[in-house]
Amino acid sequence: MESSMFKPSSMDLIRAGLQDLDRARALFGQLKADAIADGRCAELLGVLAHACDPDVALGNFVDIVNAMQSSRRDLDRVIPDAGALRRLITVLGASDAMGKFMRFRPELVEAASVGSADSHLFNRAQRRARLLMAVGADPDDQAMPVASKDLAEAATALRAGYRRQLAAIIAQDVMAEDPIRIQPTISSELSDLADAALEGALAIARHETEGNEHVRFTIIGMGKLGAQELNYVSDVDLIYVVEPADKDVDHQTLIRVGTKMGTMLQRVCQSVIMGVAEQPLWQIDGGLRPEGKDGALVRVLSSHKNYYEQWAENWEFQALLKARPVAGDPDLGQAYMDMSRPFVWSASKRKNFVYDCQKMRKRVEDLIPAPLKDREIKLGRGGLRDVEFTVQMLQLVHGRTDESLRTSNTLDSLQRLSEGGYVSRKQAVRMSQDYRFERVMEHRQQIWSLKRTHLFPDLGRASVGGLEKKRDIDVDELNQNQELRRLARAFGLHPEELVDKYDDTRREVRHLHLDIYYRPMLPVNAQMENDQIVLSVEAAQERFESIGFGDPDAAIRHVQALTAGVGRAAKINRIILPAVLQWLGEGQNPDMGLLNWRKLEENFGTESGYLGFLRDSTSAAQRLCHILSNSRFLGDALNKSVESISWLGDDGNLQARTREALDVQTGSALERFGSNINEFATSMRAMRRHEIERIGLSWMSGVISDSDSLKAMTDVYDAIIDASLTWAVRHQIAAFGVETAPAGITVIAMGRYGGREVNFSSDADAILIYRPADDADDGQANAFAKKVVEDLRNILQGPTTLEPKIELDLDLRPEGKNGPLVRSYASCEEYYESWASTWERQALLRARYAAGDAELARDFLINIADPLRYPTAELTEAELQNIRKLKARMEAERLPRGVRRERHLKLGKGGLSDVEWTVQLMQLQHAGDIKDLRVNGTLEALDVLEAKKLISAIDAIQLRKTWTLCTAARNGNYLWSGRANQADILPDDIYSLGGIAVYLGYGAHRGQHFENDLLAVMRKCRDVCQRLFYGQTEGEATAAATATASAATPQPQTAPRPRMHVIAPRLERNRRRAQR
C-alpha cells in the first residue's frame, strides 16, 4: 500500500459534512499508510458526505480499522471495494451503537459492508433455519426443534446470529435511495428476524426443560410483531398457548412444563445469562395475555376461549386483530387463530366497542407528559397510533361483513379499505405516505443507539407546538442541534425543513382521521373532494352504529337534512359535521345530540349566526356536542335561547353572575313591568331558567365547581325572590291606597335554600314573617301581608305564565301546613317559645335572611332562632330519641312508593339526609359552646366539626364525599333527564346511570361503574351515620352495613369471575398497556 499520509483540506472536510475539523484531521492522521492507502482515504472522504453523522462515522471507522490492525485482520478482505466502504460508512453514520459493536465483531462489519453476506436477502424460512442451526437444532423439524448446545453457548450463538442479520438489515435500510418506499419491507424483515429468534429461543427452552417432548407449544405474536411491522428496538408482545403432545399428560404437568419453557424462552431473549457476553435482544411483554401480567403465563386453547367469551374487555378484541403465530407448533398456532378470529370480527357489535377504544386512545394521549406531547412520534396526536387506530376501527366495523378487510398489517389493511370503497384512493395514498414517513423517523431514532425510543429530537423551547399553535423556532438553534441535524440528513432535508414536514404530517394525519372515518357518513352531495368515497347504506349504518347511534337510519336522515341545499347553514354543516359526529359519539346519547343539533338549525339556522361561530370556535362546538348528547334539559333550553351558545366560546361568559349583576336585571324588570304581574312573573321565571342554563352549561363545561354552582343557584333564587317581594309590596301599597307599607315583610330561607345549597331542581323552602309598621294596626298589617304573599306566590308559582314555576315551599313554617302562610313576628315569638318541637329547632339551623325587611330578619334570627338552634344546655335523651324517631318516620313516609331505600339519593340509606341530620345533630349539641359551628351550610359545619376534633378525619371525609357525590348526582340526573320529580331517584337502568355518571367525571357508558362506586360510598356513609347519629357501636354499625351490602348485591347467575386479585389491578394494567 502507499506510504504517504493523506491530508485533506478544510474545504474537503466541510464538503464531506464534517463539523469538528481538527478532530477529523487527527483521525485521518491515525489511518497509517499500512492500514489504508491514500486512494482509500479519498474514497472514505467522498462517502462520508452520505452519512447522517459524518463525524461519528469517521470516528467509529478509525476505531474499527485500529481494532482490525491489532487483531491482524485483512481490511481489504472485509472492505474490498468502494461500494462496501460506502455501505459501512452509511451504517456507522446512522448507528453509533452498531459502530461500537463492530469494533470487536468483524462479522458485523462484513454483514453490513459486504454483499456476499447476503443475510438481508434471506426469506423467513432461511432466517429461521440459520438461527436454529446456530443453536444446534434441526431446521427441518417444523413443530418441535430442540437445541443441542448448552444454555450459554446456544444463547451466545443465537444473539450473535441475530445481530449479524440485524446489521445487514440496517445497511439495506440506510442505503436505500427511498427509505420511505421500502419501510414496509424493512419492518417485515425485522419481524421475520424476530420470529426466527423466538424459534431459536424456544428450541433452547426445550433443551433446558425436562418433559418438553410432552408439550405442544406455540407463540402468538401481538402488536407490531403480529402485524409484521416491528421496529428495530421494541418490546415484543407475546401470548403462549400449550396443548398436550400425548394423551398421558395431565393438565397440571402440562401447565408446569409449559410455564418453565415460557420462562426459559423469555430469559434467553431478555435476561443477562452467566457465561453469555452478548447483550439481550429485546424485552418480552406478556401483558396482552388473558388477565394480563396477573394471569397464567401459559394456557391451553380452551382456557383462552373461555376468557374471551366471558371476561375480555373491548380493547382486548382490538388487540387480537394483530395476533399471528410466530413460532412453535404451527398447527396449534392455526388452531388459536381459528378460535380467536370470530371474536375479532364480531367485536364491533359489542356494547360501546368503538367508544371504549376511542377512550383508550385518548387516555394514552393524556398520559404523555406535557413536554413530550409534541415530540411523540408514536403515541402523540397525529402520530403512528392515530393512523393505526383509524385503520383498525374501519376494519373492525366493516370487517364483520366484508372478509376482504381481515388483515393485520396496517398498510395492507389500508390498501384493502381503499379497494373496498371505504377509503378514497387519494386518502389511502396520503395516509400511507404519512405513516411510512413517521415510521422511518422512528426507526432512525432507534438505530442510532439501538434503544427503544419514539421521540422526535428535543428542540428546547421549540419542542412545544406544531399542531394548534406554531413552534417558537430559531433556525440557527436548529442548525446547532446535532440530533435534529442527523435525522434531517437521513431524509436529505435541512433541520427546519424536517420540523415543518413532521408538523405537516401530524396535522394531515389528524385531519385524515376525520375525513376517512366521519366524512363518508355524510351523503354524496355533502362531500368536499371529487374522489371522496360514498358508503353503501349498509356500510353507513354500520359506521353510525359503531360510534354509538342507536337508530342509524334516523341519524342518516338527520345528516341528509342538515347538509341538503345551497344555504349557508348547509354549507357550514358540510364542513363541521364530521367533527360533530365524532364529538356526539363520545356522549351518552348521540341520537339525542344529533336530533338537538338539527332542531337548533331548524329553529335558528336561517336567522342566527351561531353555526358560523361554531365553525370558527372548535372548543365551543365540542362543548356544545358534549351538552347536546348528555343533557335533555339543556338541549331543550338551548332551543329556546340560541344566544346562549355564544357563551360556550368564552369561559368568562359562563361564569356565574354576581348578586349585583342579578339585582341590576331584576331592578330593570321591576321598572319595566311594575304594573303587569304576568309580564313580571314571566321575566322572573325566564331569568331563573336562563341562569340555570348558564350555570348548567358552565358546570358541564368544567368552568365552575360543584359548590360554586350551588351558591350561584342560591344567588339566583335570592335575587328573584327579593325582586318578587318588592314588586308585591309596591303593588299592594298602591292597592291599599297608602304611601308606605303597613307592615315589613321578610323571607327567611330554610332547608337547602337556607344552607345556600340550591340545586337545579330545588324548591325554595322558606318562612314568611311580617311586623306591623309603627303607625299601622295589626288587622291592616295582617291583611296587607296576606295580599303581598298572595302576589309573591302568584309571581313565583301561579298560573300567570307558561314559564316553569319556582316552588316556594312554606311547609317548615310554624304549625306546618296547618299554620298561616305568613305570620307576625310576635306570633312567631310566642309559637317558638311555647310550642316549638325539637325538629323545628333543628330546622332553624338552616334559617338565614333571604329577602325583604333585613332588620326584621335579623331580629327573628337573633332573638328567636339563635336561642333555639344554638342551645347552651345539652340535649336530653328524650330529645335525642325524638330526633331519631322523626328522621326514621320522615324517611318512611316521604320515600316514594316502589323506590328501594338504597336508590334514593336524599332519603335513602347513606344519602343526603343521613349526612345532613348527622351534622345538624352535632350542631345542636355543640353550637351553643362553639360559635364557629353557627353556620348554615352542611359542608361548612362539617369542616368545623372536623377542625374541632368532634368528628374524626376519616368520618368527615366519608360524609363529605357522600354529600358531594349525591348532590352532584341529583344535579346530573336533572340535567340528563329534564325531570325534576325524578332527580332524587337513582335509576335502575345502566343507560340512564351512564347519563348521570358523565356529570361526575366518568366517561359515557360507565353507568355500572358509577352505580357501584356511589352505592359503596353510600353504604360507608350509612355506617358512619349509624354510629354518630343513631349511637350504635362500631360493631353494630359494621354488622348493619354488611347486611345492607349483602341485600343490595345481586347473586351471580353465571360462572364465577376470575380471582379478585386479578380483577383489582386491571385499570392499572390497562393504563400500562395503553402506553405501548
UniProtKB/Swiss-Prot annotation:
The keyword Magnesium appears for this protein: yes
Known EC number: 2.7.7.89, 2.7.7.42
Lineage: Bacteria, Bacillati, Actinomycetota, Actinomycetes, Bifidobacteriales
GO term, biological process aspect, one: regulation of glutamine family amino acid metabolic process
Organism: Bifidobacterium longum subsp. infantis (strain ATCC 15697 / DSM 20088 / JCM 1222 / NCTC 11817 / S12)
Role played: Involved in the regulation of glutamine synthetase GlnA, a key enzyme in the process to assimilate ammonia. When cellular nitrogen levels are high, the C-terminal adenylyl transferase (AT) inactivates GlnA by covalent transfer of an adenylyl group from ATP to specific tyrosine residue of GlnA, thus reducing its activity. Conversely, when nitrogen levels are low, the N-terminal adenylyl removase (AR) activates GlnA by removing the adenylyl group by phosphorolysis, increasing its activity.
The reaction(s) this protein catalyses: [glutamine synthetase]-O(4)-(5'-adenylyl)-L-tyrosine + phosphate = [glutamine synthetase]-L-tyrosine + ADP; [glutamine synthetase]-L-tyrosine + ATP = [glutamine synthetase]-O(4)-(5'-adenylyl)-L-tyrosine + diphosphate
GO MF annotation: an example: [glutamine synthetase]-adenylyl-L-tyrosine phosphorylase activity
CDD domains assigned: NT_GlnE_GlnD_like
Chain segments carrying region Adenylyl removase: 1-521
Key words, A-Z: ATP-binding, Magnesium, Multifunctional enzyme, Nucleotide-binding, Nucleotidyltransferase, Transferase
Family to which this protein belongs: Belongs to the GlnE family.
Ranges for region Adenylyl transferase: 524-1076
Keyword presence, tRNA processing: no
Pfam families tied to this protein: GlnD_UR_UTase (PF08335), GlnE (PF03710)
Stretches for region Disordered: 1041-1076
Broad EC category: transferase
Known cofactor(s): Mg(2+)
GO cellular component: cytosol
Gene3D superfamilies xrefs: Beta Polymerase, domain 2, Nucleotidyltransferases domain 2
InterPro entries, alphabetized: GlnE (IPR023057), GlnE_rpt_dom (IPR005190), NT_sf (IPR043519), PII_UdlTrfase/GS_AdlTrfase (IPR013546)
Annotated protein name in UniProt: Bifunctional glutamine synthetase adenylyltransferase/adenylyl-removing enzyme
Superkingdom of origin: Bacteria
